Every structure is written in structure tokens, then in C-alpha cells.
From Swiss-Prot:
Disulfide bond residue pairs: C29-C54, C32-C41, C47-C76, C80-C98, C99-C104
Glycan-linked positions: N105
PANTHER family: LYMPHOCYTE ANTIGEN 6E, UPAR/LY6 DOMAIN-CONTAINING PROTEIN
GO cellular component: plasma membrane; side of membrane; synapse
Record's note on what induces expression: By interferon gamma/IFN-gamma on resting T-cells.
Main localization, broad class: membrane
Secretion signal span: 1-26
Residue span, UPAR/Ly6 domain: 27-118
Record membrane topology: Lipid-anchor; GPI-anchor
SMART domains listed in its UniProt record: LU (SM00134)
GO molecular function annotations of the record: acetylcholine receptor binding; acetylcholine receptor inhibitor activity
Organism: Mus musculus
Covalently lipidated residues, kind GPI-anchor amidated alanine: A108
Protein name: Lymphocyte antigen 6E
Length: 136
């Protein structure tokens, strides 16, 4: 049997196999737990069939150049916990990001803005002045 004959048999069999295969779609996400930076959160995982979202959750606290803490979590989820939350309290922030395509959670969720030391000092000064004016 010649190579051409083998190809004539092989190609239709391959085509039939490909057309008959059930297409499997598995979401792939990056995953990590309680990490301090995004470089440690680039581990790819294959999500379970029930998972429809890649999620990124981050929380940070600090002011000025003082970092009081930061944590980053990524993974697969059957639900989006909340549609892209960015809660910024000045000295602390919580962020969540959901997406539905493979490896879409590559980036870390935003760190949020942290208050500057002069801004905190001004707020404290104005609060003290207001208290002094209100006292009898």
C-alpha cells in the first residue's frame, strides 16, 4: 500500500473522528490564595464544569507610603460574587473582578487609592478645630 493510499484512508477517518467528537469547553483561570503580589498568582488551573467565571479578589490597607497589608486571591467560580466591586474607604480598599474567558484574570484587581499622609493630617486638624469650636 502506497503513502498516497494510506492518506486517502487516513484523512476521511480523521475527518469523521473530528466531526463526531463532542466539543469540550473547559474554562482555564489563574489561581492563588492569600498572595502578596500578582507574580505568585499566575498558576493556570482547569476549572470544573460548574465554574463559569474566573475571579480576582484583592484587599489593601495603608496610607501614604505605609502599606498595612495586601492580599490577592484568584480562581474559578460558579458565580460572580458581585459585578466588579471597587470599594475604596480612603485607607483601605476591596476589589473584585469577574470575567468569563480563559485566562482573563491575568491582572491583579486594582489596588485602589490610599489616602496621603497630608490629607489624613488635614482631616485630623479640621476635626480637632471643629471639636474646639463646639465645646462650651
Amino acid at each position: 500500500m502506497s503513502a498516497t493510499s494510506n492518506m486517502r484512508v487516513f484523512l476521511p477517518v480523521l475527518l469523521a473522528a473530528l466531526l463526531g467528537m463532542e466539543q469540550v469547553h473547559s474554562l482555564m483561570c489563574f489561581s492563588c490564595t492569600d498572595q502578596k503580589n500578582n507574580i505568585n498568582c499566575l498558576w493556570p488551573v482547569s476549572c470544573q464544569e460548574k465554574d463559569h467565571y474566573c475571579i480576582t479578589l484583592s484587599a489593601a490597607a495603608g496610607f501614604g507610603n505605609v502599606n498595612l497589608g495586601y492580599t490577592l486571591n484568584k480562581g474559578c467560580s460558579p458565580i460572580c460574587p458581585s459585578e466588579n466591586v471597587n470599594l475604596n474607604l480612603g485607607v483601605a480598599s476591596v476589589n473584585s473582578y469577574c470575567c468569563q474567558s480563559s485566562f482573563c484574570n491575568f491582572s491583579a484587581a486594582g489596588l485602589g487609592l490610599r489616602a496621603s499622609i497630608p490629607l489624613l493630617g488635614l482631616g485630623l486638624l479640621l476635626s480637632l478645630l471643629a471639636l474646639l469650636q463646639l465645646s462650651p
